[in-house]
Amino acid sequence: MSKPLILVTNDDGISAPGIRSLIAVMQEIGTVVVVAPDSPQSAMGHAITINSTLHLNKISAENAAVTEYSCSGTPVDCVKLAVNEILKQKPDLCVSGVNHGSNSSINVIYSGTMSAAVEAGIEGIPAIGFSLLDYDWNADFETFKPYIKKIALEVLQKGLPDSVVLNVNFPKRKEEDLKGIKICRQAKAMWEEKFDKRKTPQGKDYYWLTGEFVNHDKGEDTDEWALQNGYISVVPVQFDMTAHHAIQALNNWDLNK
């Protein structure tokens, strides 16, 4: 029986510790091809490159166990190039991450990590985005390798519903403090942005984005609650953004009179 073909990408860049851990786990499962940004692309969302050239650089040796490419574009560019130019086929699974920092709640909208997974889902590829609630470059990814493998194998064996990808977030906890895996909904939270106004040496104004993450949702079925209480959160994310519950109300508007 042939091994599954697995595409690995991220938004922190191809040299980030998180993706190196993810590659190691995927090697235990299947044949791995890596296409990841050549520099950090955090918070790029679903951006694609249309007004400049894209460059791929094969960085793995010909006989290497894992085929690796760095890409000058965004995480979504990486997935598009991988499927259409490198693999020339759909892989059995696409995994993105492991991100340095949480992508729970509203962060899923801004996340390059999750946008890469969503792009794979749009292409009809089962996909998972993994993130760790720890921004330290030397964060402990080893603790979560067994959970990454478990979730990836479940997706490979059972598949995912149409137009759905998984958003998996790990709490910053030691192994003995983890309470398990919890299927959740996305918490209703947001960033309250502020801009730090500064001046260049030439006296021109510029701005530095700051802010505070505010969780207005106290539900115990949310990803934020799960992470704060020692659970690994798994949220099924859909990329059909239609607000189906609002269609009937809008049909009652007098738009055709």
UniProtKB/Swiss-Prot annotation:
The keyword Cytoplasm applies. Its cofactor is a divalent metal cation. It catalyses: a ribonucleoside 5'-phosphate + H2O = a ribonucleoside + phosphate. One of its GO terms (cellular component) is cytoplasm. Its main location: cytoplasm. It is found in: Cytoplasm. The keyword Disulfide bond does not apply. Binds 1 divalent metal cation per subunit. One of its GO terms (molecular function) is nucleotide binding. Keywords: Cytoplasm, Hydrolase, Metal-binding, Nucleotide-binding. InterPro entries: SurE, SurE-like_Pase/nucleotidase, SurE-like_sf. Its EC number is 3.1.3.5. A divalent metal cation binds at D11, D12, S42, N99. NCBIfam families: PRK00346.1-4, PRK00346.2-2, surE. Belongs to the SurE nucleotidase family. Nucleotidase that shows phosphatase activity on nucleoside 5'-monophosphates. This is 5'-nucleotidase SurE. It comes from Flavobacterium psychrophilum (strain ATCC 49511 / DSM 21280 / CIP 103535 / JIP02/86). The gene is surE.
